[in-house]
Amino acid sequence: MWTRYSQLWWKRCERRSLLSGAAAAALARPAIGGAAKTLIFVPQSPLASLDPVWTSAMTTRNVGFMIYDLLFGRDEFMNPKPQMLEGYTVQDDGKRWVMKLRPNLWFHDGERVLARDCVASLKRWMQRDPGGATLIARMDALEAPDDRTILLRLKKPFPALPTLLSKFQTAAVMVPERIANGTDPFKQMKESIGSGPFRFLADEYVIGSHAAMAPFDRYVPRDEPASFTSGGHRTMVDRVEWKMIPNAATAANALLTGEVDWLEMPMPDRCRC
C-alpha cells in the first residue's frame, strides 16, 4: 500500500537502486499531498489470485496488505502489534485469550466488521495454514461472545499467537463471515472484500494484465505511526494501478518514459547500487 511507511521504503530503495543519470531524472513519482494522483506499479509476476489464505504468492500477499487487514501487524523490527484489535488480555495461565476489536471497523461492502466475521475468517485460515493447524490442535473453542470480542480458549498455552496471526505468507486476513463460511479453504474466494485502506475495483480486474485499487473512505487508521504492517496506514494517492509487464526491458522503458511509476524488480543493469 502507498502509505507513509511506503514513502520511507521508496527512499530506501532509491538509495540502493536508483536509475542513473537522465533515467533518474525521468522517474515519475506520485505527488505527496498535491493534486489527485495515480500510482502505477509493475509487480514482479502476474497477479493471478486475490486470496492470501489460498496462496502464498508474493504478488497476492502484497496486494492483500492493501485490501485486507489483520488482527495483529508487525512493526519494522518484526514485533507483533495489535492492528484491528484495540487490545487483548491473556488469562487462565495463558489458556484464555480475550481480544477486543477496535470500534469503527468497516468492510468494503459497507458492513461493519464484527467479531463473528473474524472468528469465521480465522477458522477458514486455520484449515489452510500449517501454523493454523497447530493452533487447532491446541484449541478448545473460538467464539464471539459479543460484536467486538473474540474469545480463544486453549488446552494449553500458546504464547506465539500474536506472531502467528501477524505473519505475511498465507496471512490470516479478515473477511466477511458470509465469504469465510461460504468458501472452501482449498478454493479461492470469489470476492475480494476486506477492511484495509484500499478497496479492490473488481470491475477493472483483468487476470494477468491489470488491477486497480482506490482508497476506502471509511477506513480509520490507528493513531500510532505506521511501521511496516502495523500502525496507522494512511493512503497518500487517489488510485493505485497494478500493470503487468512480463518483459523486463519493456517495463524498464515504461519507467523511463513515465508510463509507470514503480518497478518491483528493475533490471540489474539499469540500477546503480
Model-derived segments and their meaning:
Residues 1-13, 24-26:
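N-terminal secretory signal peptides
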Residues 36-45, 96-98, 196, 211, ...:
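Short, well-ordered beta-strand elements
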Residues 42-92, 123, 193:
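N-terminal lobe/hinge region of extracytoplasmic solute-binding protein
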Residues 48-53, 79-81, 160-163, 207-211, ...:
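Short, solvent-exposed loop/turn elements at domain surfaces
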Residues 86-131, 145, 151, 242, ...:
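Aromatic- and charge-enriched surface segment that lines or borders ligand/interaction sites
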Residues 100, 134-181, 185-206:
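Surface-exposed binding/hinge segments that line
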Residues 102, 221-273:
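Ligand-site clamp/hinge motif
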Residues 191-228, 251:
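Bilobed "Venus flytrap"/periplasmic-binding protein-like clamshell domains
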